[in-house]
Amino acid sequence: GFPQDPNFKIASGGKGIADDGSVFLKLDEYQWRIGVHQDDNNHGILYIGFEVDNVSKLEEAKQHLINHKVDVLDGSDEDARSRGVGGLIKFSDPSGNPVEIYYEPTLDYKFSSPVAGQTFVASNLGLGHLMILTASREQTFDFYTKILGFKLTDYISFDGGDGAWFMRCNPRHHSMALSKFGEANGMHHIMFQVDSIDSVGRALDRINAAGIKISSTLGKHINDLTTSVYIKGPNGWDVEIGAETVNIHDDDKWIPKQFVEGDIWGHHGIMDSVAEVSADLAAKDNDGKN
């Protein structure tokens, strides 16, 4: 649901739709994971949130960022209320993506999907992952690993090109991936993990029945072993629905690997999708400059 009383954080109940038309989507016991807002400027990503344990950790993160010459803003009480958290700070990564660190998210009832039997793999693993296209990949990678403390998981080279770099901040194989494709800056896809391959298949049945465009066929990634399908989202970027993603529980024993291809099988069309999303991002960027 969405907050009705400005003196309280987001409350349970309701349809999760705000007066301005914003929609808040739930995956697990967190009050919400995805905020969808009307944006006439086609910004795409309006915020990416990462959680810390408490207010002391938030203050430590703030000071750490300041020490590294990052411009940090304190989130207002209204910001915290609208996000459903105890408090937050705001800054941008070198690619221009707006990032927030927060503590004390509102938790409520367990998730119950309108699709019977559907569950997501989230909770302490976060909502899933983001694949970001960036012309400043090296600087952005250094920012997330050397300043924010993410760990490198793997590299993949696509068709001999720049490929993607995968990073984690919890046991999930990766929460963030960075790919360089020309001068494009923005999101290529967001991934949601479901509880089984059968759930992926049933989702694919619903996708086909709804006539939604499939960007990349069913396939299995070589690095995180996810079996998934990619579909075209309404804002131009892709949505990946997958299952059986690798988790990493011992950082000391994990050795990053470099792969020269992205998949064990399937995922036909994925490079065409990257090119299509990149072109769309470039067009939106040009529109914003005109």
Place the predicted regions along the sequence by residue.
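Conserved active-site tyrosine of GNAT-family acetyltransferases
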Residues: G1-P3, K9, L65, G96, ...
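An N-terminus-focused feature that recognizes amino-terminal "leader" regions
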Residues: G1-Q63, N67, D71-L88
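Core segments of cupin and vicinal oxygen chelate
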Residues: G1-W32, I132-H174
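Short, structured motif recognition centered on aromatic/hydrophobic residues
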Residues: F2, L25, V36, G44-G49, ...
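Short beta-strand/turn micro-motifs at beta-sheet edges
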Residues: I34-Q38, A116-T119, M176-K180
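Vicinal oxygen chelate
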Residues: D39-H64, I66-A135, W165-F166, E183-N290, ...
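A compositional/structural signature marking long, glycine- and acidic/polar-rich segments
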Residues: I156-L225
